[in-house]
Regions:
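Alpha-helical segment proximal to the catalytic Tyr-Lys
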Residues: 3, 43-48, 102
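Residue(s) in the substrate-gating loop at a strand-loop-helix junction
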Residues: 15
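Short C-terminal tail/terminal secondary-structure segment
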Residues: 20, 94, 105-125
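Active-site loop-to-helix junction immediately N-terminal to the catalytic Tyr of the SDR YXXXK motif
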Residues: 21-29, 41, 122-123
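A glycine/serine/threonine-rich, flexible loop-to-helix segment
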Residues: 57-78, 88, 118-125
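A conserved structural motif in NAD(P)-dependent oxidoreductases
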Residues: 78-89, 100
Length: 125
């Protein structure tokens, strides 16, 4: 890391997959779990000059998301009833990088619409 007089803010983009297993995503989930731990560790090591935080992002509607899953079906499993929009994730990153979050470091902000509705509570279509 280059020496500097002032501090900075790092925002890592992680995933709910770091804490929520899913078939076929073991390597991805392990990498994201590692990123979550790296965030917490670097926040301690680099304080007080550098703040390090992460976003744990759930499903996001993108131009390619339809290739991976049916967004309307998946949205029914999210408490807010929809997938995130890219700008909603971006706004969270801007917040963590901004002076408004000047006392936030080592945090992981969940950007997942409330998580996942348990299967036994889902309404049948």
């Amino acid at each position: 890391m280059q020496q500097q007089d002032s501090g900075g803010a790092i925002v890592n983009v992680s995933s709910v997959s770091g804490t929520r297993p899913s078939p076929g995503t073991a390597a991805y989930g392990a990498a994201k779990a590692g990123l979550d731990n790296l965030t917490a560790s670097l926040a301690i090591e680099w304080a007080p000059k550098v703040r390090v935080n992460a976003l744990d992002v759930g499903l996001v509607r993108t131009e390619l998301s339809h290739l991976h899953y049916n967004a309307d079906v998946v949205a029914k499993t999210v408490p807010l009833g929809r997938l995130a929009e890219p700008d909603e994730v971006g706004n969270c990153a801007v917040f963590l990088a901004s002076p408004m979050a000047s006392y936030v470091t080592g945090a992981t902000l969940a950007v997942h619409g409330g998580g996942e509705v348990p299967a036994f509570l889902r309404e049948e279509s």
